[in-house]
């Protein structure tokens, strides 16, 4: 490098990870306008600057694993995130925002009994007399538990991934369950929510109590992602705003055969990546066993039934059976399980 050379420093984000690229140009290779130069900040050698990095896993921040029942969608997720902190919930028709995010709930606590003069009452042995009393406390549910855990990791130079796993996402009314959290699903190139949302006063108070003392090492870089010079990290710590960090993964499963329960609208779908889990032989050697000693290969049965579904009048991919549709013990699927689960499903939902 010689005097007069030009060095171009370019910052970019790839899969949520901030990277820097240096490009060198000779004096005659590029023209640089004086207006391009701006002194941003003088950084002392003693100051440490952390890039927006995080330990990554293979897969997008938000994705739905879908396929026929029994294809191993939950098993696939477990294998991918087993070593990381994860929080699991299952949607159903009665799931609502409070059950997913959190709300005030009555709980029973033991408290001292006070006399008329305001002193604690004691029994004959001198022990304080206690009574049960109903109080209301804000109870965090799966979303807030994962949210807080992910921001706690942001206190480290390389935050570890935190997973929020939603089983059977289409069995619940997603619009009702997510509410305004829906807006947080829009992520920028760095993996943080594009549009922070304002938390209600009750939630803000509880989040401030938990997040207020967190030391976010990448606060300056995170704030730089947002226009207007706002200290969004301070807003997150105060609880006034909600913002998904780039290490919070939200993965869900969906049985395509159940998609008619609560249809997912197109706006919600666009905010997710979709991963199809196809039907395949898991090579476990499962066998259907009967009391008379007869045994039948499970995969051969599945293949024959799925071929009938595909080639017959049904012709619906989502009605097929996956390898893990029936639970096997010691590699055997009992006659009772086969009749009560497999044949019942085929009779009731397929044929």
Predicted regions and their residues:
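C-terminal regulatory/interaction module of P-loop NTP-utilizing enzymes
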Residues: 5, 11-17, 21-351
